[in-house]
């Protein structure tokens, strides 16, 4: 006795709706005997497969402060590969000893006997002088700073709030 499988729709590809019905039927064969036992015509069994239901629960939503990396419409909640260990006051870090390209003066400059600075490649002797011009208020790197278009929006909101408070105070004085 052999079995054949038939499927609703094309049998070479998966259906697009996620469900498929398979019907298995028995086909009698004559294998040498005249004793053919008649079998019922029709399906022996039906197997119906259905795709699992999709979740209808809450989905991810992004706050306004989430960064849109590279203006590509993709928002990220994490910033990769940035680690800033906590330091005690006065403790130096390896980034402090590196030269800072944002300063306009030479950190390696030492006062010579004639009062002129020399920028030779000799090792430093004594403590390094800290310059106030290099201390920035925001110690954020490029990944931690807001993109320029977001900074402009924030500044515009602040200005609008400042101007509205000025108008309100002028209206109060004129009444």
Curated annotation (Swiss-Prot):
The keyword Nucleus applies. GO terms for molecular function: protein phosphatase 1 binding; protein serine/threonine phosphatase inhibitor activity. GO terms for cellular component: nucleus. Keywords: Nucleus. It comes from the Eukaryota. Pfam families: PPI_Ypi1. Its main location: nucleus. The keyword Nucleus applies. It is found in: Nucleus. Residues 16-29 have a biased composition (Polar residues). Residues 1-74, 88-175 are annotated as: Disordered. Residues 1-15 have a biased composition (Low complexity). Transmembrane segments: none annotated. Residues 150-161 have a biased composition (Basic residues). Residues 32-42 have a biased composition (Acidic residues). Residues 102-112 have a biased composition (Basic and acidic residues). Regulator of type 1 phosphatases which maintains protein phosphatase activity under strict control. Belongs to the YPI1 family. This is Type 1 phosphatases regulator YPI1. It comes from Coprinopsis cinerea (strain Okayama-7 / 130 / ATCC MYA-4618 / FGSC 9003) (Inky cap fungus). The gene is YPI1.
